[in-house]
A protein has these predicted regions:
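C-terminal catalytic/substrate-binding lobe primarily of soluble NAD(P)-dependent oxidoreductases
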Residues: 2-248
Length: 248
């Protein structure tokens, strides 16, 4: 699709809501705190990997298939480390579509020190604030029946097409919670997260992917992966995006 990649931004967002809860994260709050409050890693050509402050580069991205606009910010995620090792891009970053409310909640958790892993003494009992917070919230694995909406993961690629013209696309997969619950009995975020290593293991087992040592999934041919994704009943799509700001 591209002769030059200016930027590769992984964008992950949803419009999921849980009936009966004002705040019930669809993924582990312990892990979410780790990813969102650690300094985000960004890659830039000529600079390499560097970190920024949490919640940097706020933008509103319009996610497809009815999810709509969501506030997205940089977070720490492994794709930023893996992609630049094999793919020539001027910039690589990862953004979560957390939404304004979730961003405010995470900032408050940090301000109150509830993100701390180190234990504190509470009436003679040693307690980790983050563990306490996690135990106080509903287990995401149990929320599927009450969850409504869709989740989306994809890559926003900007650069030049094969003819040297500005091009921007969002390559994505959307999972509807109603579908994943009906077909697999798993809520959408858990299913979309788990299907990736399942497909990777199949491709390694049947010899399509032949890794040696430690490898990132982004380093292998993508078509066999995308074909298997559809065999599991889901699909991937390419949406054209605004090319403003892309220069030849």
């Amino acid at each position: 699709l591209f002769s030059r990649i200016d930027s590769c931004t992984i964008l992950d967002g949803s419009n999921l809501r849980v009936d009966g809860y004002d705040f019930a994260p669809s993924f582990s709050i312990w892990t979410t705190i780790e990813e969102c409050l650690n300094p985000p890693v960004v890659w830039e050509d000529g600079r390499g990997w560097y970190t920024t402050t949490p919640f940097s580069e706020l933008e509103i991205f319009d996610f497809p298939e009815g999810i709509g606009p969501v506030e997205c910010v940089n977070v720490e995620h492994e794709e930023v480390v893996l992609i630049p090792q094999k793919i020539d891009a001027k910039k690589v970053n990862f953004k979560y579509g957390l939404g304004a409310e979730f961003i405010t909640i995470l900032k408050t958790i940090n301000m109150l020190g509830m993100d701390r892993k180190e234990t504190v003494e509470v009436q003679g009992v040693s307690v980790s604030p983050r563990d306490l917070l996690t135990a106080s919230l509903p287990d995401p694995a149990t929320l599927g029946e009450r969850m409504r909406g869709k989740t989306c993961a994809g890559a926003l690629i900007k650069g030049l097409d094969k003819q040297g013209n500005p091009k921007a696309v969002y390559i994505y997969n959307v999972v509807d919670n109603a579908w994943s619950m009906k077909e697999f009995g798993d809520q959408a975020v858990v299913w979309q997260t788990a299907i990736n290593p399942v497909i990777a293991l199949e491709l390694i087992h049947n010899g399509t992917w032949k890794p040696r040592g430690v490898n990132g999934p982004e380093w292998f041919e993508s078509k066999p992966y995308l074909d298997l994704l559809e065999e599991y009943g889901t699909s991937w799509h390419i949406r054209d995006e605004d090319t403003a700001g892309i220069t030849k």
